[in-house]
Amino acid sequence: MFHKELLKLYFICGTTTCQGKNLYTVVEEALKGGITLFQFREKGEGALEGLEKLELAIQIKELCKKYNVPFIVNDDIDLAMEIDADGVHVGQDDIGVDEIRKLMPDKIIGLSIRNEEEFQQSKVEYVDYVGVGPVFGTQSKDDAGGTIGYEGLELMRKLLPQMPLVAIGGIQTKHIKDIIKTNMDGVSIISAISYAKNIEKTVREMSEQ
């Protein structure tokens, strides 16, 4: 069952976006700090594939379960179904959300939308939440596209007044208060958590914003 409070502090990570640290340990520290949702995003140069990816996904899914935090898979619908993940998150160029809803009727489905043009072509009636961004410049995602700033967040809230919305892209602790003022339901973060020296403490500080 999805509710918008899950978006409050949404951590996204994979082995290629945690500076060579052990991903399991990184996620465990973030869970201890109080993340509300986790997305396994195994992409980019050197990303795990096949059995290695599957085994790690299962381990982290079980870890998230221990903390009652839903486990979302980025893009890989087959993996999400195979390991019975709590949901999937897809971009504009991935499989259509209407198709995913047929395959995963009871799961959480998230969709990335950057601007009004993408909004017009999106079947938002099939999704549980929308990821809006990139708000700021980001090193974590090489496919992120142009930044939208706070204005872009405000526009998306006007276009989707009732939809649970989470901001993404280059977000640091200092930005969170201003992002929430744009009526976002939460923030999704990659490197500001995974690169932190003390992940648990950083996450705690973020959740207090």
UniProtKB/Swiss-Prot annotation:
<feature type="binding site">
    <location>
        <begin position="39"/>
        <end position="43"/>
    </location>
    <ligand>
        <name>4-amino-2-methyl-5-(diphosphooxymethyl)pyrimidine</name>
    </ligand>
</feature>
<dbReference type="InterPro" id="IPR022998">
    <property type="entry name" value="ThiamineP_synth_TenI"/>
</dbReference>
<feature type="binding site">
    <location>
        <position position="170"/>
    </location>
    <ligand>
        <name>2-[(2R,5Z)-2-carboxy-4-methylthiazol-5(2H)-ylidene]ethyl phosphate</name>
    </ligand>
</feature>
<dbReference type="Pfam" id="PF02581">
    <property type="entry name" value="TMP-TENI"/>
</dbReference>
<dbReference type="GO" id="GO:0009228">
    <property type="term" value="P:thiamine biosynthetic process"/>
</dbReference>
<comment type="similarity">
    <text>Belongs to the thiamine-phosphate synthase family.</text>
</comment>
<dbReference type="GO" id="GO:0000287">
    <property type="term" value="F:magnesium ion binding"/>
</dbReference>
<dbReference type="InterPro" id="IPR034291">
    <property type="entry name" value="TMP_synthase"/>
</dbReference>
<feature type="binding site">
    <location>
        <position position="74"/>
    </location>
    <ligand>
        <name>4-amino-2-methyl-5-(diphosphooxymethyl)pyrimidine</name>
    </ligand>
</feature>
<feature type="binding site">
    <location>
        <begin position="138"/>
        <end position="140"/>
    </location>
    <ligand>
        <name>2-[(2R,5Z)-2-carboxy-4-methylthiazol-5(2H)-ylidene]ethyl phosphate</name>
    </ligand>
</feature>
<keyword id="KW-0460">Magnesium</keyword>
<keyword id="KW-0479">Metal-binding</keyword>
<keyword id="KW-0808">Transferase</keyword>
<dbReference type="GO" id="GO:0004789">
    <property type="term" value="F:thiamine-phosphate diphosphorylase activity"/>
</dbReference>
<feature type="binding site">
    <location>
        <position position="112"/>
    </location>
    <ligand>
        <name>4-amino-2-methyl-5-(diphosphooxymethyl)pyrimidine</name>
    </ligand>
</feature>
<feature type="binding site">
    <location>
        <position position="94"/>
    </location>
    <ligand>
        <name>Mg(2+)</name>
    </ligand>
</feature>
<dbReference type="GO" id="GO:0009229">
    <property type="term" value="P:thiamine diphosphate biosynthetic process"/>
</dbReference>
<protein>
    <recommendedName>
        <fullName>Thiamine-phosphate synthase 1</fullName>
        <ecNumber>2.5.1.3</ecNumber>
    </recommendedName>
</protein>
<comment type="function">
    <text>Condenses 4-methyl-5-(beta-hydroxyethyl)thiazole monophosphate (THZ-P) and 2-methyl-4-amino-5-hydroxymethyl pyrimidine pyrophosphate (HMP-PP) to form thiamine monophosphate (TMP).</text>
</comment>
<keyword id="KW-0784">Thiamine biosynthesis</keyword>
<dbReference type="GO" id="GO:0005737">
    <property type="term" value="C:cytoplasm"/>
</dbReference>
<feature type="binding site">
    <location>
        <position position="75"/>
    </location>
    <ligand>
        <name>Mg(2+)</name>
    </ligand>
</feature>
<dbReference type="InterPro" id="IPR013785">
    <property type="entry name" value="Aldolase_TIM"/>
</dbReference>
<dbReference type="InterPro" id="IPR036206">
    <property type="entry name" value="ThiamineP_synth_sf"/>
</dbReference>
<feature type="binding site">
    <location>
        <position position="141"/>
    </location>
    <ligand>
        <name>4-amino-2-methyl-5-(diphosphooxymethyl)pyrimidine</name>
    </ligand>
</feature>
<comment type="pathway">
    <text>Cofactor biosynthesis; thiamine diphosphate biosynthesis; thiamine phosphate from 4-amino-2-methyl-5-diphosphomethylpyrimidine and 4-methyl-5-(2-phosphoethyl)-thiazole: step 1/1.</text>
</comment>
<feature type="binding site">
    <location>
        <begin position="190"/>
        <end position="191"/>
    </location>
    <ligand>
        <name>2-[(2R,5Z)-2-carboxy-4-methylthiazol-5(2H)-ylidene]ethyl phosphate</name>
    </ligand>
</feature>
